[in-house]
Amino acid sequence: MNYVPNTVDQQEQILTRIGVGSLEELFADIPESVRRQAQLKIREGLSELELVKYMGRLAAENKTVEEYTSYLGAGAYEHFIPSYVDQLLLRSEFYTAYTPYQPEISQGTLQAIYEFQTLVCELTGMDGANASMYDGASALAEAALMSCDATRRKKVLVPQTIHPEYREVLRTYLLPRGVEILEIPYQEGAVDSEALEKALNTEVAAVLIQSPNFFGMIEKAEEIGQMAHAKGGLLVMAVNPVSLGLLKSPGELGADIVVGEGQPFGNPLNFGGPYLGFLACREKYVRRMPGRIVGATKDKNGKKGYVLTLQAREQHIRREKAASNICSNEALCALAFTIHLSGLGKRGLKEMARLNLQKAHYGAEEIGKLPGMSLAFQGPFFHEFVIKTEVSPRKINEALLSHKIIGGLELSRFYPELDQHLLFCVTETKTKEDIDRLVAGMGEIK
């Protein structure tokens, strides 16, 4: 597609074709008072060389993980991405936004999506998965709507240990649909089980949990699932896929629907996106899933083939009654996820998860030895942890920047009661020397 603006001759042809004499006549319905009178101040075009230098100067103003050592997490994670991921990802046959409606010319794309779905099912212990979602937050919101549809109930329980921005997206999706959201407090960095049990009744469609949660803590998912099921509700789990290299799968813990942010596999930080969400569920809920689903079948010659299946759920079939109203998906990001995870294999994933766990615990232990600093919550955590500090978190982060270290997230941004707390993330990308440098830098701050 050509993005060069129309020429004067082309404009005249368009106006003649639609029966309008001039541009002024075309825009006659727009009042003069709201029209821009002055010309836009747009500079002259740049040569390619000038443009590359200009964009390079702009990019140099950013602080990236190439130049700085970062301990930020909170939903976007720095992981090592092997070179084979981009080598395969950027092949021209994959590098397209085309939705594969015509299976006869889309077998490669369809098979790649099918493999993604298969990997998600293996990771989560679920029976079916879709082709991907926009991100982890929208996947969780769609899972909540699935739960309401499946149970015919209009209330969900949402712990405050779920990512605060995920909770914002939940409100955006659910409140206009008349779904009541009841937030459950936390205790020691995990869901307050007593408060949850009191809030549970036969009006609740689902209990939503995130494990590892926003604070990095492992929730008691199996116990929470049993409580939800006892009242006829569902258990929806948001998970970090890397953690599943060590932890029990959500399916083993009794989850009915599982979602998550897929960015940790194959997708760089990208200053916040694009990312991808995944959504998987038990077989009885598959027809309520949003998004595309690719299925395996056989052609008339008995050869294996792939097609978009269960399309009666989708908007191009059922319009406003559709279970799915997703206009696209994150297929290229999902392909990066698939390539990275396939390359790791079970053993590689387990090793990756083990490194994340060990390095985070080493970092937490060493920081906790510093005067005026301690681990805020006691309990099992994966690769994120909260540090309580007597020094201002902002002062700590500003001081660390002078060492080219990006420190933890100031939790007061989302939790006013945690104004002296920082959330740190340590992944396999950090060496012992990196962590020791962080600890030394924090130790200098008075």
Curated annotation (Swiss-Prot):
Keywords: Oxidoreductase. Disulfide bonds: none annotated. It catalyses: N(6)-[(R)-lipoyl]-L-lysyl-[glycine-cleavage complex H protein] + glycine + H(+) = N(6)-[(R)-S(8)-aminomethyldihydrolipoyl]-L-lysyl-[glycine-cleavage complex H protein] + CO2. GO terms for biological process: glycine decarboxylation via glycine cleavage system; nucleoside metabolic process. Its EC number is 1.4.4.2. It holds the Pfam family GDC-P. It comes from the Bacteria. The glycine cleavage system is composed of four proteins: P, T, L and H. In this organism, the P 'protein' is a heterodimer of two subunits. The glycine cleavage system catalyzes the degradation of glycine. The P protein binds the alpha-amino group of glycine through its pyridoxal phosphate cofactor; CO(2) is released and the remaining methylamine moiety is then transferred to the lipoamide cofactor of the H protein. This is Probable glycine dehydrogenase (decarboxylating) subunit 1. It comes from Desulfitobacterium hafniense (strain Y51).
